[in-house]
From Swiss-Prot:
The keyword rRNA-binding applies. The keyword Ribosomal protein applies. NCBIfam families: S6. SUPFAM superfamilies: Ribosomal protein S6. Binds together with bS18 to 16S ribosomal RNA. This is Small ribosomal subunit protein bS6. It comes from Arthrobacter sp. (strain FB24). GO terms for cellular component: cytoplasm; ribonucleoprotein complex; ribosome. One of its GO terms (molecular function) is small ribosomal subunit rRNA binding. Keywords: Ribonucleoprotein, Ribosomal protein, RNA-binding, rRNA-binding. InterPro entries: Ribosomal_bS6 (IPR000529), Ribosomal_bS6_CS (IPR020815), Ribosomal_bS6_sf (IPR035980), Ribosomal_S6_plastid/chlpt (IPR020814), Transl_elong_EF1B/ribsomal_bS6 (IPR014717).
Length: 101
């Protein structure tokens, strides 16, 4: 199991109160495969740096989770198939290096 960070930009036409429940449907892929979800952080509506699909705003969400590499790929695939998801990015956070004194 590896730690991952998922950033999602959701279509701004979606109601903000329905973002977390709809995101939870996708995150079930992680829990069903034995992974864990550490934190779900909904940033809300933000201005985009450039237009995506002719939209200048999006609803940002960041999810920290632990899963197998294949599970992360499957989650990314399922998110990309959804029309309300404008962009996704899954990264592995850098490990903190301990400095010996």
């Amino acid at each position: 199991m590896r730690p991952y960070e998922l950033m999602v930009i959701i279509d701004p036409e979606v109601e903000e109160r329905t973002v977390e429940p709809s995101l939870q449907k996708f995150l079930n892929v992680i829990t069903n495969d034995g992974g864990t979800i550490e934190k779900v952080d909904i940033w809300g509506r933000r201005r985009l740096a450039y237009e995506i699909k002719k939209k200048s705003e999006g609803i940002y969400a960041v999810v920290n989770f632990t899963a197998k590499p294949d599970t992360a790929k499957e989650l990314d695939r399922q998110l990309s198939l959804n029309e309300t998801i404008m962009r996704t990015k899954i990264t592995r956070p850098e490990e903190q290096k301990v400095v010996a004194e």
